[in-house]
Amino acid sequence: MKRTYQPSKIRRQRKHGFRHRMSTKNGRRVLAARRRKGRKVLSA
């Protein structure tokens, strides 16, 4: 059986990247929460 995680930089950015987070209300909420928590990296 093959592994379920087959990394792809493009898919990673499109689904979890900064611009994708900014494109939705909830995504912006995620970024705000990560800023509030003091995360060094906000998104993929």
Swiss-Prot record:
GO molecular function list: structural constituent of ribosome
One Gene Ontology CC term in the entry: ribosome
Keyword list, A-Z: Ribonucleoprotein, Ribosomal protein
Pfam families in UniProt: Ribosomal_L34 (PF00468)
Disordered as annotated region, ranges: 1-44
InterPro entries with a match to the protein in the record: Ribosomal_bL34, Ribosomal_bL34_CS
Listed GO biological process terms: translation
PROSITE patterns on file: RIBOSOMAL_L34
Gene3D superfamilies: 1.10.287.3980
UniProt family annotation: Belongs to the bacterial ribosomal protein bL34 family.
Name of the protein described by the UniProt record: Large ribosomal subunit protein bL34
Gene for this chain: rpmH
